[in-house]
């Protein structure tokens, strides 16, 4: 949930670190800091708040060519300057940044560091104080670093500098992402390649239980046992322009607008030599061999999984269960005889999902990861990967990854159906192309969406979304988008469930957004709208062309009924965006949230 960077080379390091941290703010932005090392010692700058707040306190007169940085999402200790990283050892010799959670930090603190006066409330400070203790006991820095790592339980990505050695960064990884970037006369470490695209596109992945000794000329990867590891670098297939806002005021709006292009790219990427949509035969064989599919995901990805379940069961006639990853880990259901797991994660680093994958791997079950990030932890540890090809998603609130996940699940469902002899009565390629065109039209309806947000949501404290069948799943996502960026208490409900309790919350003026895109439940959902209107609600009905009724606020051009979630979500994304904007909220970086949730 935090982001770390490090640089060692020949350039002044401050701006490289700050720009790198700006690219990692999606991982957390409670506080931030950098530490740079030169002949006069270590200079630490840290501040509560955003990278912009940190920039204001960095001394421009301090020059150095080695340094580390961190942007934080608090897990241990409140957001504050004291708890911000980097943390230093008691003497100030060692300075360290850390992403992850040290589960046994209290035990380590008690058993090894009882005589140390700690400066913060974080688990991270235990690491740097322990390194110094072992150096005082006579170990070299590398030996002390290695011994410290051997005592830690939990997740970590660490970068550390030694005030007595301007030529080295020490780094390590376990269950939290960390890459080493390679350059000519310099090397870097980072949680994400995006952070260091400014200086290199060549990276080496670290695996769990590995540490790395980084100098300006060499990178030495080792196991905790001291064995040297050789690993080929990869080229990050990102352009720096992909992670810039360009002319957009916010990343979220840019990413909403990118959705039509993402759908078209997915069509292109998943076409075989005959121009037909297809999935790798090995994956389809696994799907056919399974007696039940288990989709495991969190948040927006979980909502995409619910739509995927509908498509797979309807088209391929394969039973599917969808589970919240954080619950599955601690309450595994009774599994079928031949389960196949599908993990959905935009980042491929979601800790809750990875915890389930570790369990299922131990049990010997096959797994597929659907992710936007090739080479991510979930991608590496699953048997198969289906890529989203959505491009970098920077805004914390997911938009284009959600629709990409549904599109890929649709292609998987269609391929499995075809392999089982269930031919679809429509051309999925053509229908997805229509979806992309309709998405484009919806993205052009920003003024109408802004007006809806203004009319219904500017002053409200709560909002309800209602739908039936697959519309209900989209309502869950619409409510999540609204609550996470506008801070309006929003909930999505199945229309028929209102009368079983929720309708008690309806009062004069309560906004209720209803989706009506499914013909077989159209009359039912409109009956539910009448129920809330009778209790004083202020209804906003968004319907599909051909199913519209009198008074509907917005009508979506028609697409195939099974693919409506791909388009009906776009108005909800835009409504949430403008509601947040009107309320003065930080659209891209909502409070208390982080994009890549790498702690359980």
Swiss-Prot record:
Record CDD domains: GFAT, SIS_GlmS_GlmD_1, SIS_GlmS_GlmD_2
HAMAP family: GlmS (MF_00164)
Transferase keyword on record: yes
Primary localisation category: cytoplasm
GO CC terms of this entry: cytosol
Gene3D superfamilies listed in its UniProt record: Glucose-6-phosphate isomerase like protein, domain 1, Glutamine Phosphoribosylpyrophosphate, subunit 1, domain 1
GO biological process: carbohydrate metabolic process; fructose 6-phosphate metabolic process; protein N-linked glycosylation; UDP-N-acetylglucosamine metabolic process
Keywords: Aminotransferase, Cytoplasm, Glutamine amidotransferase, Repeat, Transferase
Name of the protein: Glutamine--fructose-6-phosphate aminotransferase [isomerizing]
EC number assigned by the record: 2.6.1.16
Known partners and oligomeric status: Homodimer.
Molecular function GO terms recorded: carbohydrate derivative binding; glutamine-fructose-6-phosphate transaminase (isomerizing) activity
Residue ranges constituting the SIS domain according to the UniProt record: 283-422, 452-590
Chemical reaction(s) catalysed: D-fructose 6-phosphate + L-glutamine = D-glucosamine 6-phosphate + L-glutamate
A Pfam family reported for this protein in Swiss-Prot or TrEMBL: SIS
Keyword Ion transport attached: no
Active-site residues from the entry: 2, 595
Primary role: Catalyzes the first step in hexosamine metabolism, converting fructose-6P into glucosamine-6P using glutamine as a nitrogen source.
Subcellular location, record wording: Cytoplasm
Residue ranges of domain Glutamine amidotransferase type-2 in the record: 2-217
């Amino acid at each position: 949930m935090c982001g770390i960077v490090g640089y060692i080379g020949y350039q002044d390091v401050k701006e490289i670190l700050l720009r790198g941290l700006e690219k990692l703010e999606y991982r957390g932005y409670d506080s931030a800091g950098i530490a740079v090392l030169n002949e006069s010692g270590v200079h630490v700058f840290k501040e509560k708040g955003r990278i912009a707040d940190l920039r204001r306190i960095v001394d421009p007169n301090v020059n150095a060519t080695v340094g580390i940085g961190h942007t934080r999402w608090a897990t241990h200790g409140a957001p504050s300057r004291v708890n911000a990283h980097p943390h230093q050892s008691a003497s100030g010799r060692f300075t360290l940044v850390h992403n992850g959670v040290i589960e046994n930090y209290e035990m380590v603190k008690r058993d090894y560091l009882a005589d140390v006066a700690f400066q913060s409330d974080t688990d991270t400070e235990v690491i740097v104080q322990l390194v110094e203790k072992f150096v005082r006991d006579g170990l070299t820095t590398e030996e002390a670093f290695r011994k410290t790592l051997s005592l830690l339980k939990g997740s970590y990505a660490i970068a550390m500098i030694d005030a007595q050695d301007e030529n080295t960064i020490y780094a390590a990884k376990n269950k939290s992402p960390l890459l080493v970037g390679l350059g000519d006369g310099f090397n870097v470490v980072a949680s994400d390649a995006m952070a260091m695209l400014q200086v290199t596109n060549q990276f080496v992945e670290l695996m769990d239980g590995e540490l790395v000794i980084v100098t300006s000329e060499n990178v030495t990867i080792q196991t905790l046992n001291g064995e040297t590891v050789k690993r080929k670098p990869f080229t990050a297939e990102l352009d720096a322009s992909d992670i810039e806002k360009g002319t957009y005021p916010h990343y979220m709006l840019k990413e909403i607008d990118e959705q039509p292009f993402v759908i078209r790219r997915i069509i292109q990427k998943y076409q075989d030599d005959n121009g037909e949509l297809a999935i790798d035969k090995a994956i389809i064989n696994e799907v056919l061999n399974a007696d039940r599919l288990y989709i495991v995901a969190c948040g927006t990805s979980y909502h995409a999984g619910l739509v995927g379940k509908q498509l797979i069961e309807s088209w391929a006639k394969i039973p599917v269960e969808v589970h919240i990853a954080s619950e599955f880990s601690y309450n595994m259901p009774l599994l079928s005889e031949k389960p196949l797991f599908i993990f959905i994660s935009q980042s491929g680093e979601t800790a809750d999902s990875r915890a389930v994958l570790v369990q299922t791997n131990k049990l010997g079950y096959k797994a597929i990861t659907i992710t936007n990030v090739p080479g991510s932890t979930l991608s590496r540890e699953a048997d198969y990967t289906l890529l989203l090809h959505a491009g970098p998603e920077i805004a914390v609130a997911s938009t284009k990854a959600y629709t990409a996940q549904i599109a890929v699940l649709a292609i998987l469902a269609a391929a499995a159906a075809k392999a089982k002899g269930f031919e679809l009565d429509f051309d999925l390629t053509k229908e997805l192309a229509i979806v992309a065109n309709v998405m484009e039209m919806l993205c052009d309806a920003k003024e109408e969406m802004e007006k809806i947000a203004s009319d219904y949501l500017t002053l409200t404290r709560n909002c309800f979304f209602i739908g039936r069948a697959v519309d209900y799943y989209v309502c869950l996502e619409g409510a999540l988008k609204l609550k996470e960026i506008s801070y309006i208490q929003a909930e999505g409900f199945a229309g028929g469930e209102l009368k079983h309790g929720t309708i008690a919350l309806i009062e004069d003026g309560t906004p209720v957004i209803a989706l009506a895109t499914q013909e077989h439940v159209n009359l039912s959902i409109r009956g539910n709208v009448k129920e809330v209107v009778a209790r004083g609600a202020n209804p906003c009905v968004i319907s599909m062309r051909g199913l519209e009724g009198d008074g509907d606020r917005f009508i979506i051009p028609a697409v195939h009924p099974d693919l409506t979630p791909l388009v009906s979500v776009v108005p909800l994304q835009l409504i949430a965006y403008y509601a947040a904007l009107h309320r003065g909220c930080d659209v891209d970086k909502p409070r208390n949230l982080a994009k890549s949730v790498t702690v359980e």
